[in-house]
């Protein structure tokens, strides 16, 4: 009972804190583009119409060729996801300030209600995809993801260098930073 009350209180606090006025998100299609958008802003991306579920991850990673891609699978209703985003913010900011080729990508599905998602993402710098249930569930199934948050890191060539699919959750600042550095230094 106490755990439930604590969890509900935490979820309420996270929800209320995400209601603060934040910068507006920009929308962009998923066709390959030049890297003209500001990496320290919020960019909404969409997948090409009719893309097979098997190609979703490859398509997203391909958008960021030449960059290390840190993917966060999350949902607006997930308290641990929101907590993890707060934890990774200083790491993200340090790479953005250093102008390192690192893209932070956030993927969720329709279980994150559209209005809540639109209200939440302005406080989360990076690239955002909100997939259909079919796309999101298919992607989670294909990767073997059983829970969120889950992280996946690809190097500048699009090759996986790290994931925590088996265990899920936020792996910690040290692991995330070490894996980003590993990916940046990979030839």
Tell where the protein language model's regions lie, with residue ranges:
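Conserved hydrophobic packing residues within short motifs/helices of P-loop NTPase cores
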Residues: 71, 105-107, 152
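Conserved redox-active cysteine motifs that mediate thiol-disulfide chemistry
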Residues: 73-90
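A short beta-strand-turn-helix
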Residues: 48-69
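Thiol/disulfide oxidoreductase modules built on the thioredoxin-like
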Residues: 83, 134-181
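Short pre-active-site segment immediately N-terminal to redox-active cysteine/selenocysteine motifs
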Residues: 67-69, 73-77, 147
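Extracytoplasmic/secreted envelope proteins and their assembly/folding machinery
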Residues: 54-61, 85-92, 114, 118, ...
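Conserved segment of the thioredoxin-like fold in thiol-based oxidoreductases
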Residues: 93-135, 145
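N-terminal targeting signals for export/organelle localization
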Residues: 1-51, 187
